[in-house]
Amino acid sequence: MKFSSAVHFSQRGVHPTDVELETIAQTWSEHCAHKTFRANITTESGASRPSLINQLRASTDKINAPYVVSSFVGNAGIISFTPGRSLAVKCETHNHPSAIEPFGGANTGVGGVIRDIMGAQHTPIACTNILCFGPPDTDTLTLPEGVFPPRRTRDGVIDGIADYGNKIGLPTVAGAVLYDPGYTANPLVYAGCIGTSNSFVDQVAPQPRDRIVVLGGRTGRDGLRGATFSSMTMDATTGDVSGASVQIGDPITEKLVIDLLADAQHLYRAITDCGAGGLSSAIGEMAEGVGARVELTHAPLKYPGLAPWEIWLSEAQERMVLAVAPQQCEDLRTLCVLHGVEYTDIGEFTGDNQLVVTYNNEPVLQLDTDFLHNGRPQRNMRAVMPKPNRTTDQTAPKWLTQHGAADILMALLGHPNIASKASVIHRYDHEIRGATAVRPLVGQVGDGHGDGVVIAEPLDDFGFAIAIGVNPWFGIHDAERMALACIDEAMRNVVAVGADPDKAVL
């Protein structure tokens, strides 16, 4: 049965606390609950259509590829690569944060997908990104209030990606940079990460009496309400109102956690990262169907003065939450000391299906986990099905008829979407780890854009390819054909660098 939050608290006969309201807002946000993807859809004629998430899953279910280990659940998709070895893949946008704080938004976007790979029990080995901005020569006088010049946004985003990837020691190996006026106010920052594991075992649910252990960074006010902010429509006031929603990245701390988890896979039962919602989302998700009790005063803070809801909801970076059996806590603590990673026990999983949070032993939140995760109202949406424009205009643009072939060629080569992106690619270290067998820039002097890249561990005689397909302008005329064209381009690119198309995944 579905309840509104007001009905839920009325039936309990209590007033909600600020911690409870913030937790529900985060858990039910578009960013976390994917309400649009899960919405019931009807067309203009009244016909029902599958939800978007079911449509996305349908092709994977239909193909039923034997090498797909896990999809549409958990932190990342997982495929088998070679006997005893698996790969995890995760991509995620960080658009709103990058629009109001380009460096920090892109910086923590990279950190977030890296932690998702860690949460899938894989070791990160490479990063990707697709970036779309407004035209760099946009007249600043024409920009809406509160919108940064596209050149400033672009430079900040690229700086943020380079800073995190280079410092953490992961190669940024594949991507794209595109420009269009449609991305002026809200850029596309689509970060990705690939990880590998030689010992992947599907996680089990936390068990009653398991300890809730937080590893890595400390909690601060950065990243407050990030999940709800990312689900909002932006306007001229967004940067001022939501500036604190952008987290502060710390790649060195995250690198220490990566190294720790590579040695600690046998010491925990379940793991996830503090992404959107911080402890609220991480513990809330892990406690679904189990229950948990948390004491917030045990959480390590960057500085004093945080309110309970701020400690619980902060999206401060580089933190992982683990479910650890009591008898393994001391071994994990010892390993944390060895790796220089902070270890904090803040509670336990209970088995009563209740999420209880206290501050100085006083309750500030008590919610049934079934209500928290399944009680949100179902969204219903009406789909307007535009007719694709599949006609062909054979008339040459007037500009082309007024210029010679040489002028046209130079104009094309100088267009931001065609011109070399080497200046961007060289900002990223794509050689670190020594596993980039086919590089993003190829040719006799290494200045030509390749079709894709190949990652092969130094002692292996095999590898895997990464390639990208992107064409947003196609979607203006025909969204369905755009998707087909992008997949077609990506497939041709992986084939061009020697990959087997029968084992490709999206």
Name these PLM-found stretches:
Residues M1-L506:
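Glycine/proline-enriched, intrinsically flexible loops and inter-domain linkers
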